[in-house]
């Protein structure tokens, strides 16, 4: 999973993700927008569900983040289906509306985002 952080002329940080992970970039750009407290909440949730059967979800204005002990899923709220309806090999997939990745990979992006934010 490749990513890039950019700062626009107003100083706002934008995240660009590799193909198949665009929704993760959109989540950072639309939901996080520099809100490090939200990232604290996500990191705490990842620690809480690690090694358990539990999952956690955070619905935002445009995107919802789900995570369990192994995987993170970010989907556009406009898709309107629940996590239970996603099946192996599902036929509906839109790279910009749905992204899946491992928890550790996601937390690496979160850490890199924090680091980039501090380089003002």
UniProtKB/Swiss-Prot annotation:
Superkingdom of origin organism: Bacteria
- Read off the InterPro entries from this record: UPF0231 (IPR008249)
Matching HAMAP family: UPF0231
Q: Which family does it belong to?
A: Belongs to the UPF0231 family.
Which protein, by its recorded name, is this?
UPF0231 protein KPN78578_01240
Species this protein is from: Klebsiella pneumoniae subsp. pneumoniae (strain ATCC 700721 / MGH 78578)
């Amino acid at each position: 999973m490749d990513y890039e952080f950019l700062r626009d002329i107003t100083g706002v940080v934008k995240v660009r993700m590799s193909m198949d992970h665009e929704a993760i970039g959109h989540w950072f750009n639309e939901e996080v927008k520099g809100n490090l407290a939200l990232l604290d909440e996500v990191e705490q949730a990842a620690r809480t569900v690690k090694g358990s059967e539990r999952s956690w979800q955070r619905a935002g204005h445009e995107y919802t983040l789900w995570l369990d002990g192994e995987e993170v899923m970010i989907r556009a709220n406009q898709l309107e289906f629940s996590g239970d309806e996603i099946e192996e090999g599902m036929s509906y997939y839109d790279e910009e509306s749905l992204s899946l990745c491992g928890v550790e990979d996601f937390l690496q992006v979160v850490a890199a985002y924090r680091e980039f934010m501090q380089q003002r």
